[in-house]
Design a protein with these regions (language model features):
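Histidine-centered active-site loop/cap adjacent to the catalytic His
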Residues: 1-11, 25, 29, 360-385
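Membrane-interface motif at the C-terminal end of an N-terminal transmembrane signal
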Residues: 15-36
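Membrane/wall-proximal cationic-aromatic binding patches
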Residues: 29-123, 312, 316-322, 326-328, ...
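Conserved SGNH/GDSL esterase-like catalytic core that processes O-acyl groups on lipids
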Residues: 95, 105-185, 197-201, 205-208, ...
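Short beta-strand segments
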Residues: 100, 129, 155-159, 266-271
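Short, amphipathic alpha-helical "lid/cap" segments that border enzyme active or binding sites
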Residues: 139, 245, 249-252, 367-378
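Serine-dependent acyl-ester chemistry module
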Residues: 160-327, 348
């Protein structure tokens, strides 16, 4: 009998804790939704080093650690009461607002492109970008903040490396599932796992796949690439009818519903580092990348996914990388009041001039990349809607 009572008590406690996990997931296991921001009213001093790059998490055990880990920059970031990055220079009004993901938030630079845009235009520019946001989260934030004050321009910084894929992802943690909730709790309590190590070569030394040697004219760079960001550039001809594209349309609808018709609207098309610099990878290493290439295809269920597609004709391959840009242009052509600001030509031209616009060990822009983006966007805005 005592054993039965003990077992019954344990089952009751387990049921209560499970209920608590599902009712209060954010408190017990952390944010469950991608839209949740954890930076409200925070100030942080950032020292950004090569080893802080996101490629080490994206490609565990595959990236050779940098020989020189001296800081790129040191700066301070502050976020407002809603968890969005505060402008470098406060203004009384913000007639321009930018939305997007980590490229827009600019966590790893002192001055994101929103600040450069404010300088170029001479007006306040509000930054509503946040890390890991996709079209669904951008739509939610647009509904709340796009018309928080009168706007002349509203911009969506659309990162072509993952926004289309993130359009159909599930929640960060599915708190509706007891199994998923318990797994998330165990993951939170478990000690950090050791960082995976690269397999040894014949001599026993680690064999790393990254970074890759890049030569542009007289300049040499070691750059780490995340290949699937390049894969997302090759969208299929029927991509506009995919579920992913429908979610992008819904995000555009959210902006339209929030804004008066006279507000100018634009999607800023942000190319990934892989799109801009992969053509300059040294030929032998580029052949390795080409052999492992995949491209986007439409699944029977209507979502976009990947399929192996080794590169046989490089010229045709590089031409195909404009497909994603063309898809977004087509979606914007379906509605009034929107224009496309494509950063690809300016970034390709700058790369050809041997300028490095992304961090070597990170997928994001360095300060030069943000500065160039601000310049291109400002010129487009000055041309009018």
């Amino acid at each position: 009998m005592p054993l039965l009572l003990s077992a019954g008590g344990a089952m009751c406690a387990l049921a209560l804790l499970t209920a608590a996990l599902m009712l209060l997931p954010d408190m017990l296991i952390g944010p469950t939704q991608w839209v949740t921001r954890t930076t409200a009213n925070r100030t942080m001093d950032v020292t950004w080093r090569p080893s802080d790059g996101d490629v080490f998490a994206a490609l565990p055990g595959q990236v050779r650690p940098p020989a020189d880990d001296a800081p790129y920059a040191a700066f301070r970031i502050a976020w407002d009461t809603a968890g969005f990055r505060l402008p470098a220079e406060p203004h009384g009004a913000y007639p321009v607002a930018v939305f997007g993901d980590s490229f827009t938030e600019g966590f790893n630079v002192e001055r994101p492109y929103s600040d450069g845009l404010a300088d170029a235009l001479g007006v306040g520019v509000r930054n509503y970008g946040y890390r890991a946001y996709g079209p669904v989260e951008v739509a939610q934030v647009a509904g709340e903040f796009a018309a928080a004050e009168p706007r002349q321009w509203v911009l969506w910084g659309y990162f072509s490396g993952n926004d289309l894929g993130d359009a159909v992802r599930g929640p960060r943690i599915d708190a509706r599932s007891p199994v998923a909730a318990w797994r998330a709790l165990f993951d939170r309590l478990r000690p950090p796992s050791p960082t995976p190590t690269a397999p040894p070569d014949e001599s026993g030394a680690p064999r790393y796949n990254q970074p890759l040697p890049v030569i542009i004219g007289g300049s040499y760079y070691d750059l780490a690439f995340v290949s699937y960001y390049a894969w997302w550039q090759q969208t299929p001809p029927d991509a506009a009818s995919s579920r992913n594209a429908d979610v992008v349309r819904a995000a555009l609808d959210a902006f339209d519903a929030a804004l008066p018709p006279e507000t100018c609207r634009a999607v800023v098309f942000i190319p990934p580092k892989e799109r801009v610099y992969a053509r300059y990878i040294v030929e032998g290493d580029r052949q390795f990348v080409n052999a492992a290439n995949q491209r986007v295809v439409t699944s029977p269920g209507g979502t976009l996914t990947f399929a192996p597609a080794p590169v046989e004709d490089e010229a045709a391959y590089f031409d195909s990388l404009y497909a994603h840009r063309d898809l977004i242009a087509a979606l914007l052509a379906e509605r009034a009041g929107w224009r496309l600001i494509d950063l690809t030509p300016a970034f390709e031209a700058a790369a050809a001039e041997e300028r490095l616009l992304y961090y070597p060990y990170d997928t994001h822009w360095n300060q030069a990349g943000h500065d160039l983006a601000a310049q291109v966007i400002a010129e487009a805005i000055k041309d009018g809607c």
